[in-house]
């Protein structure tokens, strides 16, 4: 994350203000009589603990700067020049690490997003090719999860008559899953030559992705039974001898919002219902969070797009081996590597850009 400390006046003033606040709280808490009179003693103690971390970073940064300046005087000595130059480089690297810690400290905590996530992939325009691309994207996210040793579970899928999927929902289990994958939401466009294309013409197809956090039970919205319509039907997926013999698949409709969720992955109707309810609650929660996080949405939309399904975020051009992320004008020529799960080369740059934008927002 590239961010200049010394040249950014707003950042210097922000850190100065926080340092003064730390000193102010320290004086209050050090006086037992004054501290007891404070109605918000607990909150002050909590704020002090947090600011104490920043204070340690700032002290380390000051110490490193002093060491660098004192070592620079040794550069004038021919015998000590190389040694001094090496020492300065070592401390400059340490300085970068401390500065990054300070930047991360300033970014608002998103504890509510430390959770598993659901990735919902739907075919768009392009017919057969779009369905095949849904399958390819599903495989890409599963491969990515395998590389990171994250557990995955296919919650629901709808087969296409031409092969691939019309729609698939994957659950990715890891506390960092949502924060890492949240910017995958949006429109994904693929350009490639279909196997059945005899004249070598490139076809363009689209898929849309929605990434939703799986919230803890106590954070999930309460759903009235009267607001639900639950239908059962026979599974069309893999199920061995039980396939199409029992109505084990579940379709849940949330009547007030008209959100519909299906699950047919399990043989058990009860398990399918539980999975479908999880997805439904996560969709409802995602809508609530979107409304509450207006400030974050402004940053997200201005920098990274709205995350809406209609908002094209990425193009995969197979003939050229190219992937372009339109939100940050990033182009790489490693399409096979990405489709095999190395998504970090696309994910990390956009997360860094997002963090930088949040810092700029804080300093306004």
UniProtKB/Swiss-Prot annotation:
The keyword Protein biosynthesis applies. Its main location: cytoplasm. It is found in: Cytoplasm. GO terms for cellular component: cytoplasm. It comes from the Bacteria. Methylated by PrmC. Methylation increases the termination efficiency of RF1. SUPFAM superfamilies: Release factor. SMART domains: PCRF. Keywords: Cytoplasm, Methylation, Protein biosynthesis. GO terms for molecular function: translation release factor activity, codon specific. InterPro entries: PCRF (IPR005139), Pep_chain_release_fac_I (IPR000352), Pep_chain_release_fac_I_sf (IPR045853), Prokaryotic/Mito_RF (IPR050057), RF-1 (IPR004373). It holds the Pfam family RF-1. The modification N5-methylglutamine is found at residue 241. PANTHER family: LD18447P. Peptide chain release factor 1 directs the termination of translation in response to the peptide chain termination codons UAG and UAA. Belongs to the prokaryotic/mitochondrial release factor family. This is Peptide chain release factor 1. The lineage of its organism: Bacteria, Pseudomonadati, Pseudomonadota, Gammaproteobacteria, Enterobacterales. The gene is prfA.
């Amino acid at each position: 994350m590239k961010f200049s400390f010394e040249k950014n006046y707003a950042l210097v003033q922000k850190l100065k203000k926080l340092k003064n606040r730390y000193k102010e709280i320290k004086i209050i808490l050090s006086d037992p009589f004054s501290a007891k009179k404070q109605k918000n003693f607990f909150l002050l103690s909590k704020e002090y603990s947090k600011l104490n971390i920043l204070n340690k970073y700032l002290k380390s940064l000051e110490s490193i700067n002093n060491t660098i300046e004192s070592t620079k005087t040794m550069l004038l000595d021919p015998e000590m020049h190389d040694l001094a130059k090496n020492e300065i480089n070592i401390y400059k690297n340490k300085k970068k690490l401390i500065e990054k810690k300070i930047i991360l400290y300033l970014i608002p905590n998103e504890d509510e997003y430390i959770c598993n996530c659901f990735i919902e992939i739907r075919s768009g325009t392009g017919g057969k090719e779009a369905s095949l691309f849904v399958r390819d994207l599903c495989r890409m996210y599963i491969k990515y999860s395998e590389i990171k040793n994250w557990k995955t579970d296919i919650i629901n899928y709808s087969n296409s008559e031409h092969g691939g999927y019309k729609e698939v929902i994957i659950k990715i289990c890891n506390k960092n899953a949502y924060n890492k994958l949240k910017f995958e939401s949006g429109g994904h466009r693929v350009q490639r030559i279909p196997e059945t294309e005899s004249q070598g013409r490139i076809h363009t197809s689209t898929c849309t992705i929605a990434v939703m956090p799986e919230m803890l039970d106590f954070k999930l919205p309460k759903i009235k039974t009267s607001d639900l319509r639950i239908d059962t039907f026979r599974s069309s997926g893999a199920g061995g001898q039980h396939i199409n013999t029992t109505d084990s698949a579940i379709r849940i409709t949330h009547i007030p919002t008209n959100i519909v969720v299906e699950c047919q992955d399990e043989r058990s109707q009860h398990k399918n219902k539980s999975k479908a309810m999880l997805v439904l609650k996560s969709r409802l929660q995602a809508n609530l969070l979107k409304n509450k996080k207006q400030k974050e949405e402004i940053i997200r939309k201005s920098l990274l797009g709205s995350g809406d399904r209609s908002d094209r975020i990425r193009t995969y051009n197979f003939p050229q081996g190219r992937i372009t992320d339109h939100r940050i004008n990033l182009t790489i020529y490693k399409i096979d590597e990405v489709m095999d799960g190395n998504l970090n080369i696309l994910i990390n740059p956009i997360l860094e850009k997002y963090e930088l934008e949040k810092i700029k927002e804080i300093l306004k």
